[in-house]
């Protein structure tokens, strides 16, 4: 405490110490540093699955990333985070949402489509086939909606990229099981610009699904 007082980071105020303006600045810097270390720790095991845009972000923006990682006791943490974001958006455009992410959220997705949320999903044919065969009636009902568009693409990146009203989500999948391993969401403008370009690139090459051809 004496050293902090000598540096004029704190001052005595009655029977307690309070931070001075320089001390408050030091606290802010330390909190930012701790946030960055915590973000790095959470991302450590999935860095290699993330797009370059995340690694290229200035470290000062790391505190603006919300990182949700699955663990053995809470394997659906990324799914739950995505579902909470889905509840608050009026649009969803997603490249490679994957079965592991969308299947647990199907009820919520259906509710949001019924509420008028505009949804476009671009995924691999096998993923669409899963929903068409597992939930044939529900899939047929969704496909009849004018605010629900499903497209297929054969060559997608290994991660998912989603655009919501005010957030961008990046989902990482476990290579062997396909489970949602982690999710990053943020409102950093550079990430949103990147996500928009990813969506537009794959959207331009995507094809409408043909349910009968997929099932056959």
PLM regions with names:
Residues 94-98, 122-125, 153-154, 164, ...:
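Short His-Asn-centered micro-motif
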Residues 20, 102, 124:
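Residue-level signal for threonine
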Residues 1-37:
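Basic, Lys/Arg-rich alpha-helical nucleic-acid-recognition elements, primarily the DNA-binding modules
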Residues 162-216:
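Amphipathic alpha-helical interface segments
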Residues 44-121:
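PLD-like (HKD) phosphodiesterase/transphosphatidyltransferase domain
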Residues 30-50:
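Alpha-helical linker/hinge and terminal dimerization helices associated
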Residues 108-111, 137-139, 200-201:
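Short, solvent-exposed amphipathic alpha-helical segments in soluble enzyme
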């Amino acid at each position: 405490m004496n050293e902090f007082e000598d540096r004029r980071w704190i001052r005595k105020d009655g029977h307690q110490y309070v931070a001075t303006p320089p001390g408050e600045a030091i606290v802010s810097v330390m909190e930012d540093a701790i946030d960055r270390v915590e973000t790095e720790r959470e991302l450590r095991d999935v860095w290699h699955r993330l797009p370059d845009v995340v690694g290229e972000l200035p470290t000062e923006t790391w505190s603006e990333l919300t990182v949700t990682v699955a663990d053995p006791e809470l394997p659906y943490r990324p799914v739950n985070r995505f579902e909470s974001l889905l509840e608050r958006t009026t649009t969803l455009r997603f490249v490679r949402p994957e079965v592991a992410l969308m299947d647990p959220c199907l009820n919520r997705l259906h509710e949001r489509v019924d509420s008028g949320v505009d949804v476009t999903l671009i995924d691999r044919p096998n993923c669409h086939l899963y929903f068409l065969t597992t939930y044939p009636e529900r899939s047929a009902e969704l496909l009849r909606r004018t605010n629900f568009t499903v497209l297929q693409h054969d060559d997608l990146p290994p991660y998912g990229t989603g655009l919501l009203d005010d957030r961008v989500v990046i989902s990482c999948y476990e290579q062997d099981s396909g489970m949602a391993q982690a999710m990053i969401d943020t409102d950093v403008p550079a990430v949103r610009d990147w996500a928009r370009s990813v969506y537009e690139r794959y959207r331009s090459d995507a094809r409408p699904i043909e349910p009968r051809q997929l099932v056959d």
